[in-house]
């Protein structure tokens, strides 16, 4: 039996960029499964993020801030070998069969995420936004895309995601690991030990790379976003 939610939820739909070009499909699938499992352990979800069709994956969260964090953790877990993009939607959803895995969604919130995924793919084709990997569409007050004015939370989210993706693009693999570490609660001493460098070196890398700014922005948005 289908279950409907009148309360808006955050739907995440992601896919692997250039998946057909990967020579080792088994490696890709294994890495993706591990990344999704790691994100599910770190961020509480209404619907755990799972592979749905092909190289797409989806999940649902009670809060937009949680969906934004989950998307980043998945991406950081997969970089640099595998890059991914994300559409985030906010609105009511319908789950046709809660027992089915992966769960099949429909409704304004799901279509908002689908539209956001299409939008980010199109925007990334332009030079000025080529590093964009995440977009957000709010469909909590209207079921159609139309020309409805963007809500303040949606504006905050889109602005932050655009800057966040640009910062991520300027990081190397070590900086990705360090950012993932601070987002998941690791101390600088723990990160230094894992990387085989000194704690002051970790501090310097986190500051210069923009990782601290990303973490702080997530903490602030967690307080104001639905």
Positions of PLM-derived features:
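DNA-contacting interfaces and partner/effector-binding or oligomerization modules
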Residues: 2-126
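Regulatory/sensor and coupling segments of signal-transduction and defense proteins
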Residues: 4, 159, 169, 184-185, ...
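Linker/hinge segments immediately adjacent to helix-turn-helix/homeobox DNA-binding domains
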Residues: 107-170, 223-225
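Short amphipathic alpha-helical interaction segments
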Residues: 166, 170, 179, 183, ...
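Short alpha-helical "packing" element that flanks the helix-turn-helix/winged-helix DNA-binding module
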Residues: 174-182, 191, 222
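Short alpha-helical "recognition helix" segments of helix-turn-helix
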Residues: 188-195, 202
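Key DNA-contacting residues within the recognition helix of helix-turn-helix
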Residues: 203-207
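Short, Lys/Arg-enriched C-terminal cap helix and immediately downstream tail that follows
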Residues: 210-225
């Amino acid at each position: 039996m289908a279950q409907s939610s009148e309360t808006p939820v955050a739907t995440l739909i992601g896919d692997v960029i250039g998946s057909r070009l990967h020579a080792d499909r088994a490696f890709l699938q294994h890495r993706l499964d591990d990344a999704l499992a790691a994100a599910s352990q770190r961020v509480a979800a209404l619907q755990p993020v799972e592979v749905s069709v092909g190289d797409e994956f989806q999940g649902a969260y009670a809060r937009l801030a949680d969906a934004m964090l989950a998307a980043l953790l998945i991406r950081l877990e997969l970089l640099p070998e595998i890059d991914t993009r994300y559409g985030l939607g906010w609105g009511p959803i319908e789950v046709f069969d809660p027992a089915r895995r992966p769960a099949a969604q429909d409704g304004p919130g799901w279509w908002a995420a689908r539209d956001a995924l299409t939008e980010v793919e199109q925007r990334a084709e332009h030079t000025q936004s080529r590093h964009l990997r995440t977009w957000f569409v709010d469909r909590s007050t209207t079921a159609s895309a139309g020309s409805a004015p963007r809500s303040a939370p949606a504006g905050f989210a889109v602005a932050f995601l655009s800057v966040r993706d640009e910062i991520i693009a300027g990081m190397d693999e070590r900086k990705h690991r360090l950012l993932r570490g601070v987002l998941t609660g690791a101390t600088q001493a723990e990160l230094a030990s894992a990387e085989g460098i000194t704690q002051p070196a970790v501090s310097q890398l986190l500051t210069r790379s923009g990782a601290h700014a990303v973490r702080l922005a997530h903490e602030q948005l967690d307080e104001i976003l639905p």
